[in-house]
Amino acid sequence: MSAISAASVKALRDKTGAGMMDCKKALGECNGDEEKAVAWLREKGLSKAQKRAGRATSEGVIGSYIHSNGKLGVMVEIKCETDFVARSERFLEFAKNVAMQIAAANPVCVTPEEVPADLLAKEREIFKNQAMEEGKPEAIAEKIVDGRVKKLYKEICLLEQPFIKDDKVTIKDLMNELVGVIGENVQIGRFSRMALGEDA
């Protein structure tokens, strides 16, 4: 393996926000392949996110976005552990991106666990009826229903949605990457999306 250049370490750091040593290690582990190194850092960020998941998040910001036409607005609660992180450029950028995501993708809730039970039951029944009408056996129909429910989560659950600026990553991936970089637990709390002329 060739030596990792300082330029490639800097490029990876600029792209991910991870520390210099983490970037160098990621490039070393991935034989200098930047895309694989980004994935490696994401995985590392995920493990950091899991370690920090139980820590209290009593600080944060209310991220907001108002569309340029003034007819669509979003407010979202983004929580972290310290006011130092809450004021950081990276955290504020994340809050802005999440608010823009909500404006564009109109999620129903943050996590799959928050999907209203009546909505989920109704959708499962529709998916099952569709599968049965397609002539699928009961056991296969259930697997089809599970697959369609996962697809539904990607449409209506904020953390499962593909990021509007890069559909290769989800909002959950983005949040876990932020946790890996800042070293604190981050949570998305409540959100409100208002569009002129839409019923609440």
Curated annotation (Swiss-Prot):
Primary location recorded for the protein, binned into one broad class: cytoplasm
Keyword Lipid biosynthesis: no
Molecular function via GO: translation elongation factor activity
Swiss-Prot/TrEMBL keywords: Cytoplasm, Elongation factor, Protein biosynthesis
Source organism superkingdom: Bacteria
UniProt xrefs under Pfam families: EF_TS (PF00889)
Compartment list: Cytoplasm
One GO cellular component, as annotated: cytoplasm
Residue ranges of the region described as Involved in Mg(2+) ion dislocation from EF-Tu: 82-85
Xref: InterPro entries: EF-Ts_dimer_sf (IPR036402), Transl_elong_EFTs/EF1B (IPR001816), Transl_elong_EFTs/EF1B_dimer (IPR014039), Transl_elong_Ts_CS (IPR018101), UBA-like_sf (IPR009060)
Function summary: Associates with the EF-Tu.GDP complex and induces the exchange of GDP to GTP. It remains bound to the aminoacyl-tRNA.EF-Tu.GTP complex up to the GTP hydrolysis stage on the ribosome.
Family: Belongs to the EF-Ts family.
Protein's UniProt name: Elongation factor Ts
Recorded name of the encoding gene: tsf
